[in-house]
């Protein structure tokens, strides 16, 4: 098994090295062996016959007259500045004297990081309200957690916790005494003594 994998590894290394060396030597065109000489290459690269794209189309005087009004009609549309180009920097051909849009400048401090509290309160919605919960839910969870902490020390809660955690282990090992159960009973007894 090791000999076969070693042979494959050697073959792989030889193949990659030969490919890499062939690419290195073939980068220079003077070293590439070619079937055609440069003379033949020039002969085949020249276009043959009369090609359609070489013909130049001549415009008549009437066609030039027709194009004149069309160009004049389209120039105002070309010269109009779109609203997205209103804030382009000066290097794109805008002059300093041109009046800039004040609507975009009104939000500039928010973009630069000033006024963060206002921008965050506007842009990020209150998640409990978004999912249909209100601030009263916080108070309800606090009262429930307080009740849970108070009831944790009662014996009925300890029995419930024990039944939730230890019952699967008793089912798996019915013949053995459960050491975990004994540990919980000792802890429960100690807590009851401390409460009294």
Curated annotation (Swiss-Prot):
Induction record: Expression moderately increased by a longer photoperiod.
Modified residues annotated as Phenylalanine amide in this record: 92, 131
Subcellular locations according to the entry: Secreted
GO biological process: negative regulation of gonadotropin secretion; neuropeptide signaling pathway
Protein name per the record: Pro-FMRFamide-related neuropeptide VF
Keyword Ribonucleoprotein among UniProt keywords: no
GO cellular component: extracellular space
Tissue/organ expression: Expressed in hypothalamus, where it is localized to the dorsomedial hypothalamic nucleus (DMH), paraventricular nucleus (PVN), and to neuronal projections from the PVN to the neurosecretory zone of the median eminence.
Chain residues in the propeptide: 22-57, 95-99, 115-121, 134-196
Principal subcellular localization: secreted
Similarity-based family: Belongs to the FARP (FMRFamide related peptide) family.
Role according to the record: May act in concert with kisspeptin, through opposing affects, to regulate the activity of gonadotropin-releasing hormone (GnRH) neurons across the seasons, leading to an annual change in fertility and the cyclical seasonal transition from non-breeding to breeding season.
Transmembrane spans: none
One function term, GO molecular function aspect: neuropeptide activity
Keyword Signal: yes
Keyword terms: Amidation, Cleavage on pair of basic residues, Neuropeptide, Secreted, Signal
Signal peptide: 1-21
Originating species: Ovis aries
